[in-house]
Amino acid sequence: MFRVLNNDVYSPAVVQQQTTLAFGKASSLCTDNRSANDQCEMGENFRESGQDHIKRPMNAFIVWSRERRRKVALENPQMQNSEISKQLGYEWKRLTDAEKRPFFEEAQRLLAIHQDKYPGYKYRPRRKAKRPQNSLPSVSSILCNQMSVETLHPFTYRDGCAKTTYSPMESQLSRSQSMTSSLLQKEHHSSWTSLGHNRVTMATHIFADFPFYQSLEPRLSCAYFPY
């Protein structure tokens, strides 16, 4: 008879029933008793991993959004997690200070429990994995470097309502071009004035030589001299 009882105790059905009863008792303790509920929350949220990682204590927003997220997810099963987070953030901002006060008090209580359990705790954020850099520079990086060199010290000029930004190299080029254009204009003007002066002097010499002018044929009113 002892062997029969022993076999019944260690049968798979009995073991499964005992485990379900144990988990049912644990869940009832977490929901009914307040101190047990705190221990369950601390055990779920601040359980140490193999690398001795301690989770941060929950703040007021996380305390509030924990239950609210479940309700929103049940009401909108098609909504994604990112959209739910945006909606929760918007709703949290619209709450008044009086509505937020209970959640801040709960966060302070959880913080005190966390400090008692981990007195020397310091928040150490995880480092992000560095991405491998490519050996050859990309085209975008080369263009960005060129743009940064050209726009190192920009100068802005106003012409009416339009604004144009020039780099130092462009300003020097425009200045040199303006100087050369002004010099060319001066040389062109001086050449035209000298040419006109030569024409005037030539005409005076022709008209001064009156006998020669009278000796021309009657059909010709003037003589043409190529310059």
Curated annotation (Swiss-Prot):
PROSITE patterns linked: HMG_BOX_2
Annotated InterPro entries: HMG_box_dom, HMG_box_dom_sf, SRY, SRY-related_HMG-box_TF-like
Subcellular location: Nucleus speckle; Cytoplasm; Nucleus
Keywords, in A-Z order: Activator, Calmodulin-binding, Cytoplasm, Differentiation, DNA-binding, Nucleus, Repressor, Sexual differentiation, Transcription, Transcription regulation
GO BP annotations, alphabetical order: cell differentiation; male sex determination; sex differentiation
Cellular component, GO annotation: cytoplasm; nuclear speck; nucleus
GO function terms (MF aspect): calmodulin binding; DNA-binding transcription activator activity, RNA polymerase II-specific; RNA polymerase II cis-regulatory region sequence-specific DNA binding
Signal peptide: none
DNA-binding positions: 54-122
SMART domains in the cross-refs: HMG
A Pfam family: HMG_box
Gene3D superfamilies for the chain: High mobility group box domain
Subunit structure: Interacts with CALM, EP300, HDAC3, KPNB1, ZNF208 isoform KRAB-O, PARP1, SLC9A3R2 and WT1. The interaction with EP300 modulates its DNA-binding activity. The interaction with KPNB1 is sensitive to dissociation by Ran in the GTP-bound form. Interaction with PARP1 impaired its DNA-binding activity.
PANTHER family xref list: SEX-DETERMINING REGION Y PROTEIN (PTHR10270:SF161), SOX TRANSCRIPTION FACTOR (PTHR10270)
Role according to the record: Transcriptional regulator that controls a genetic switch in male development. It is necessary and sufficient for initiating male sex determination by directing the development of supporting cell precursors (pre-Sertoli cells) as Sertoli rather than granulosa cells. Involved in different aspects of gene regulation including promoter activation or repression. Binds to the DNA consensus sequence 5'-[AT]AACAA[AT]-3'. SRY HMG box recognizes DNA by partial intercalation in the minor groove and promotes DNA bending. Also involved in pre-mRNA splicing.
Family per record: Belongs to the SRY family.
Protein name (Swiss-Prot/TrEMBL): Sex-determining region Y protein
